[in-house]
């Protein structure tokens, strides 16, 4: 009989994730960075692997991470849910719901997860029926494009970026731990801190593209500027934007190479938090689990 168990996430679970998803999720080094180098999850209570097992065989996996988040001057704790995978041989219709119930915590103001258009609606139904009726879906689109113009900028240091004012940016504190963590990301060979006036951005460069990892203000102006800066660093730029900016950003691109819909679902346990959450929210690469 299959049961739910809790274990610390380890390298041993990399092959399990590959099997459950049927594809590589960034490589073993990425899993190591994502879960084992995470500076805010050093204790078992802060990051928990929830597994569905039949004797010694793993049939499903879910990861719950406890994070201190902030947006503008609002501080609160969240339960970030990710790496959900269920083996195709599992026929029970309740396992998905039970994973979310197993991950529920009483010490957070919100549950957060990311997924595509189809799955996010299923997850929201589970949230509203079993966790909280106070939910919100924030739709984004991840674009890979060729910028059509160069924008002026200057290189700066992570220390200066930490002093910048990050507006409507949901995630962990932009302190030295956060920037040291992003610099260890295995997919980028160089991390650049850039600014122009009061605009700041963090860009990661790989052989494939320059990716916008963090931005001080998720406005059209700031996105357009950061994308133009990426043009100096690579012919291709990858960026996640709110879907409301889709047409205007695509109009400024020489070519849109790829796009992928991503949604952030938040289930609130505090009315104060949900009421103060701005309509235009952005989440940096570090905090997208």
Model-predicted regions and their roles:
Residues 83-105, 219-231:
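Conserved acetyl-CoA-binding loop-helix of GNAT-fold acetyltransferases
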Residues 46-50, 75-77, 192, 263-266:
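Short beta-strand micro-motifs in enzyme catalytic cores
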Residues 38, 66-72, 97-100:
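Catalytic micro-motifs at enzyme active sites that drive phosphoryl/nucleotidyl and oxygen chemistry
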Residues 75-88, 206-218:
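Conserved acetyl-CoA binding element of GNAT-fold acetyltransferases
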Residues 55-56, 104-109:
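Secondary-structure boundary elements
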Residues 3-8, 12-56, 61, 68, ...:
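Amide-forming acyltransferase catalytic core, primarily the GNAT-like/NAT-type
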Residues 61-83:
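A broadly used, surface-exposed interaction patch
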Residues 33, 37-39, 66, 109-160, ...:
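Active-site/acyl-donor-binding loops of N-acyltransferases
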């Amino acid at each position: 009989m299959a049961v739910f168990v809790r274990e610390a996430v380890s390298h041993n679970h990399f092959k399990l994730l590959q099997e459950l998803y049927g594809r590589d999720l960034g490589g073993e080094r990425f899993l190591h960075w994502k879960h084992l180098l995470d500076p805010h999850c050093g204790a078992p209570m802060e990051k928990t692997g929830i597994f569905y097992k039949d004797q010694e065989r793993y049939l499903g996996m879910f990861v719950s991470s406890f994070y201190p988040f902030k947006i503008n001057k609002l501080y609160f704790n969240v339960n970030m849910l990710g790496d959900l995978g269920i083996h195709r041989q599992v026929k029970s219709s309740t396992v998905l719901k039970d994973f979310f119930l197993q991950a529920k915590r009483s010490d957070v103001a919100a549950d957060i997860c990311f997924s595509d258009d189809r799955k996010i609606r299923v997850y929201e139904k589970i949230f509203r029926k079993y966790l909280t009726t106070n939910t919100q879906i924030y739709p984004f689109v991840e674009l890979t494009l060729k910028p059509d113009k160069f924008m002026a900028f200057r290189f700066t240091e992570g220390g200066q970026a930490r002093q910048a004012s990050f507006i409507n940016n949901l995630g962990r504190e932009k302190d030295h731990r956060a920037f040291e963590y992003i610099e260890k990301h295995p997919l980028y060979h160089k991390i650049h801190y850039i600014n122009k006036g009061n605009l700041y951005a963090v860009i990661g460069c790989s052989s494939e593209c320059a990716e916008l990892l963090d931005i001080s203000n998720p406005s059209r102006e700031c996105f357009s500027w950061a994308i133009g800066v990426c043009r100096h660093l690579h012919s291709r730029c990858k960026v996640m934007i709110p879907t409301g900016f889709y047409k205007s950003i695509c109009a400024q691109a020489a070519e849109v190479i790829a796009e992928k819909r991503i949604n952030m679902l938040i289930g609130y346990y505090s009315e104060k938090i949900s009421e103060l959450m701005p309509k235009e929210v952005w989440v940096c690469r570090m905090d997208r689990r």
